[in-house]
A protein has these predicted regions:
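ALDH superfamily catalytic-core signature
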Residues: 1-102, 126, 130
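Conserved C-terminal structural/oligomerization subdomain of aldehyde/semialdehyde dehydrogenase
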Residues: 83-179
Length: 179
């Protein structure tokens, strides 16, 4: 779907002591993403819906780039397998990092509607709830934590802004298919 679904991950809110590790892990996974014709074996991400969508996603990436840093992805320097990059509507996955998400708020307001996400740190669970609410609502949110109390606090605090909340811990994460 190349990030073009209403439940695509747009904002990744991470405890500040884990953000470097999580960013590295996400970048490694994204680095293994093969872009191209989905009928080709090994391709993990196809094209955006239209060339107009490519232009819109690029415009939104340009806007987001004013307040945060791209830590993975390249708007032009990516390979496409089994298709013509110039004829198709292909787009590299982009991962931004926003170290000050309470002051640099574009990531909460701009939805690229493509393979674009922003990773951001929080200090306390209350901060994570507030950051989640700054997105002004979504169809789905997730929390991944081994702490049931923390999960409960997040769900109660963020529920009014999200259609559903997926709670994952080490036991149920193995079974989860995502959103």
């Amino acid at each position: 779907k190349a990030g073009q679904k209403c439940t695509a991950v747009r904002r990744i809110i991470v405890p500040e002591n884990l953000i470097d590790e999580v960013e590295k892990s996400i970048a490694q996974r994204l680095g293994k993403t093969t872009i191209g014709d989905p009928a080709q074996e090994g391709v993990r991400m196809g094209a955006l819906a239209t060339k107009t969508q490519v232009d819109r996603v690029r415009e939104n990436v340009d806007l987001l780039s004013k307040s945060q840093k791209i830590v993975f992805g390249d708007l032009d320097g990516f390979e496409v397998m089994g298709a013509d990059k110039k004829l198709g509507s292909f787009f590299s996955p982009i991962l931004f990092r926003n170290n000050d998400p309470f002051k640099k708020t574009d990531c909460h307001d701009i939805e690229a509607f493509g393979p674009v996400s922003t990773i951001m740190p929080y200090k306390e669970i209350e901060d994570a709830v507030e950051l989640a609410k700054m997105g002004k609502g979504s169809l789905v949110s997730s929390i991944v934590t081994p702490d049931d109390k923390e999960a409960r606090e997040y769900v109660v605090g963020a529920a009014s802004m999200h259609g559903r909340i997926l709670v994952l811990n080490k036991d149920c994460a193995k079974e989860s298919t995502g959103h």
